Amino acid sequence: MRIQSLLLLGALLAVGSQLPAVFGRKKGEKWGGCPADDGPCLLSVPDQCVEDSQCPLTRKCCYRACFRQCVPRVSVKPGSCPQDQLRCLSPMNHLCHKDSDCSGKKRCCHSACGRDCRDPARG
């Protein structure tokens, strides 16, 4: 009985450790995020992909300069960026380009005048 209990516990732990990987993403979606898209929209180009599963290895299907293409994914910290209700009157100034540019738990978020490092929104 004791061996069966241990085997059952081991099986539950193995399955449970896979649940976040299965339920946290859509089918075919790869880990990581898309890099910031600052490219100007100069011409209409057809999308090279529709979803991550169409991209090789560690690349993700992301918007870049007005169309979707396979690009290297970037690491994303937990939490979401707070909403910024302000309007910017000065030129855009980016203080970061990806979450890994920010210290600790801070995220690289869009603000009224560009991107900067901010604490994730609560709730």
Swiss-Prot record:
GO terms for biological process: antibacterial humoral response; innate immune response. It is found in: Secreted. The keyword Repeat applies. The keyword Repeat applies. One of its GO terms (cellular component) is extracellular space. Disulfide bonds join C34-C62, C41-C66, C49-C61, C55-C70, C81-C109, C88-C113, C96-C108, C102-C117. It comes from the Eukaryota. Putative acid-stable proteinase inhibitor. This is WAP four-disulfide core domain protein 5. It comes from Papio anubis (Olive baboon). The lineage of its organism: Eukaryota, Metazoa, Chordata, Craniata, Vertebrata. The gene is WFDC5.
